[in-house]
């Protein structure tokens, strides 16, 4: 996930900036606010629970900021296999859209995720990539 010494695959601002959400691995929140929000959504196991918490905070008038000067290191360098991550991201995104967005937005998210999975299953067959084939075949069933 890291490129070079400190450049993330996803864009990271160079200055303090208001953002939609931050990774749970680097999330700092006051205990009172966390309690007011009733913690993480127990339906979302991993990978989207941080985004969902920040979204609920925003709906209550609280903002999320990214501080690039703060460096945190994840001791174990990961939370599971790539397949585990992909499947839980799919589940989490769909739960987020079902809970917070309109039915049309949920269906659009579902269509986009299924389309991506179908394309990657086909690609996995074409290039004989067992990981793509197995992972995204499972994702199609979500």
Residue ranges and their predicted role:
Residues 12-15, 75, 79, 101:
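A short, mixed-charge helix-start or loop-turn motif at secondary-structure junctions
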Residues 1-2, 55-56, 74-75, 92-95, ...:
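Short, surface-exposed, polar/charged, turn-prone segments marking secondary-structure boundaries
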Residues 12-15, 20-71:
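A short, conserved alpha-helix in the catalytic core of glycosyltransferases
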Residues 1-9, 102, 121:
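Active-site/binding-pocket entry motifs
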Residues 59, 66, 70-92:
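Nucleotide-sugar-dependent glycosyltransferase catalytic core
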Residues 83-98, 103-142:
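Non-catalytic, C-terminal membrane-associated alpha-helical segments of glycosyltransferases
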Residues 3-26, 127-142:
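Short linear elements at protein peripheries
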